[in-house]
């Protein structure tokens, strides 16, 4: 073997050693990072499962889906966004401020309330079995009840299929109706008794500013999710809060059905 050939072998061996050491260091760093991250991921996965049934399967695949969608997460309580929307009508009266701080909500895009829970018997008997059917019954000529297209496990109020949504007179609400697939509102009766519903911009502003709810984390312009008008309503804890939530559901139907009772806000 010549001196040059020997040098070549030494160089190759040196480079191979460097590469092996680099690979070993990378594997070591990955192992350390995984050890540190695993407890957080495990807790986060358990939080995801605790949110109950939704559009994402209750397994690792569903968790991966919500983690990817979380990259598009939007701010949920700002008010300026409402004044940029074209709808200037309002169906809600002035609301009283909700008592106390806002409830803690999940960090996932599957939106749930984590504290300030109402009594389940009260929520099921008064909100699910009484208020929601009562509000929908006032609008049977325009709405019907069916399984939610967002949650898959909840009953929802829908605009009837026979109601046209391409009528120029319905602008700008018809775009919201299209994006929600005619769904107006649903309640998470199998979990925390919160609701999701569509509100006209000025009604959404009133609800958020008075502490009764917040936007969906994927709601906003340019986001692959529900429209900006899609709003999360905190669970009512007593009769007074239930009365406010009933007004909010009524306003949601008014907006989505283009009820002439809407008043333009200057």
Swiss-Prot record:
It is found in: Membrane. It catalyses: 3-hydroxyhispidin + O2 = (E)-caffeoylpyruvate + hnu + CO2; 3-hydroxyhispidin + O2 = 4-[(E)-2-(3,4-dihydroxyphenyl)ethenyl]-1,7-dihydroxy-2,3,5-trioxabicyclo[2.2.2]oct-7-en-6-one. The availability of a complete eukaryotic luciferin biosynthesis pathway provides several applications in biomedicine and bioengineering. The chain crosses the membrane at residues 22-41. GO terms for cellular component: membrane. One of its GO terms (molecular function) is oxidoreductase activity. It is a single-pass membrane protein. Keywords: Membrane, Oxidoreductase, Transmembrane, Transmembrane helix. Its EC number is 1.-.-.-. Luciferase; part of the gene cluster that mediates the fungal bioluminescence cycle. Uses the fungal luciferin 3-hydroxyhispidin as a substrate to produce an endoperoxide as a high-energy intermediate with decomposition that yields oxyluciferin (also known as caffeoylpyruvate) and light emission. The fungal bioluminescence cycle begins with the hispidin synthetase that catalyzes the formation of hispidin which is further hydroxylated by the hispidin-3-hydroxylase, yielding the fungal luciferin 3-hydroxyhispidin. Belongs to the fungal luciferase family. This is Luciferase.
């Amino acid at each position: 073997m010549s001196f040059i050939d020997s040098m070549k072998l030494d160089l190759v061996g040196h480079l191979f050693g460097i590469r092996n050491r680099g690979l070993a260091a990378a594997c070591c760093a990955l192992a350390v990072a995984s050890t540190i991250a695993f407890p957080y991921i495990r807790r986060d996965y358990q939080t995801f499962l605790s949110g109950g049934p939704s559009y994402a399967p209750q397994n690792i695949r569903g968790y991966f889906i919500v983690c990817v969608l979380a990259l598009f997460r939007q701010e949920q309580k700002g008010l300026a966004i409402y004044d940029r929307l074209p709808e200037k009508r309002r169906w809600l009266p002035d609301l009283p401020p909700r008592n106390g701080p806002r409830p803690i909500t999940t960090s996932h895009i599957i939106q749930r309330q984590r504290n300030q829970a109402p009594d389940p018997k009260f929520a099921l008997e008064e909100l699910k079995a009484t208020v929601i059917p009562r509000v929908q019954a006032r609008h049977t000529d325009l709405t019907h009840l069916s399984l939610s297209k967002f949650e898959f496990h909840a009953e929802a109020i829908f605009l009837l299929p026979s109601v046209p949504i391409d009528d120029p007179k319905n602008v700008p609400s018809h775009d919201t109706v299209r994006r929600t697939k005619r769904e107006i509102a649903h309640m998470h009766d199998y979990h925390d008794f919160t609701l999701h519903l569509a509100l006209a911009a000025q009604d959404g502003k009133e609800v958020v500013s008075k502490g009764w709810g917040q936007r969906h984390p994927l709601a906003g312009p340019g986001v692959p999710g529900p429209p900006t008008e899609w709003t999360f309503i905190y669970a009512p804890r007593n009769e007074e809060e239930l009365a406010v939530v009933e007004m909010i559901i009524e306003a949601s139907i008014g907006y989505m059905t283009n009820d002439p009772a809407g008043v333009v806000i200057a």
